[in-house]
Amino acid sequence: MRKLLKRMSPARIIALGFAATIFIGSGLLMLPCSVRNGVDLKYIDALYTSASAVCVTGLVTVDIGDTFTAFGQFVVAVLIQIGGLGVASMGAGVILAVGKRINLKGRRVLRDAMNLDSGKGIVKFIKSVFLTTAAFELVGAALSFIVFVRDYPPLKALGISLFHSVAAFNNSGFDILGNFQSLSAYKEDVFLNLVTCLLIFFGGIGFLVIREIVEKRFRWRRFSMHTKVVLTMSVALTVGGAVIFRITEDMPWIGALFNSVTARTAGFSTYSLSEFSNAGLLAMIFLMFVGASPGSTGGGIKTSTLFALIQGIKTAATNTSEKAFHYSVPRGVFRKASVIAVMGISVIAVGTFMLCAFEPDIAIRDALFEMTSAFGTVGLTTGITTGLCTASKLTSIVMMYIGRLGPLTIATLWYFTNGDRIKYPDGNIAIG
């Protein structure tokens, strides 16, 4: 086994780690101590729940609060945490906790998993990731407890608060409130809405950005280009989405803000999406497709990819050099962003086609929304998830898996190159 892992690429190790965690999680959820008395849990639903948790999505075919015991809910929370931080990061944390050293291969896997430029200082960075996560989740749980303790006994309110904080920071829209209600009962609670929004926002900008904000003490001029891009795009998408939802939907500003934030990979809902207008759902599909930022707990094609696409289009249209925030943008960045976007659209198109084939009675709007939500690891739904057939559930699982790993990681699993030794003449293609 050890020799096999040494021969495997970092991408394959990461992919195998996520797949193994999903199947182990499904087995744990099938244990009698995980399921409430009188509940007949099918394996496909346990597998779906595990995949949704590990891929930090939040789509569910069974209600977490009504189906699983406290132990089962704990398993789901652990799977969310593993999925959010990444299997490689959690493995590294265990290795460091027992006093072992991480070898060179392990550092390469961690570098790729965390989207880092190099493996230098990787151990220190992993430690900061765990400390940052613990800090945000504990503070989030304490603040959420203030709200939940009004409606539940203290011990149960504590459990709900911890689960909610873990789910929110890891951009996974799970809840244990029961009856598939998510946070609809708290849509007018401004305090809980803002706490949840902040947990989602910081979980979605990435650990590199959080570290830089702290180290450089909020001084904009000292931030790297990556941090400036992530913060600019995150704020722009959040504000833009809130304005659109305020205009297209019948909801107050706090509801519009919450839906704008949660659409970018979190998946909590305070309003029924089945009642949204087509314009509102279209805006939400776009936000779900873009998703969070690199190195974060969220999915989607990432905010930096959208920024690179905008810059590339601007450069091509104006025939000027690629630059932003007083930095020069490498041409390869636009090519990589284009590949990610095209692959993302292609995956969603195939998934939507398959869902329409398996579920002929579902409107294409709902099918497109469901598959974009799965690919973006969001967890929002127009209400069709619980009624999906087994084939549709498996399709959704594959979509969540691809979305969590990322299109490029999936592509590299089958990509081999020995280098091109033959040189060909340049060709020209008419574009546009």
What are these regions (language model features)?
Residues 1-432:
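Membrane-proximal intracellular helices of multi-pass ion channels
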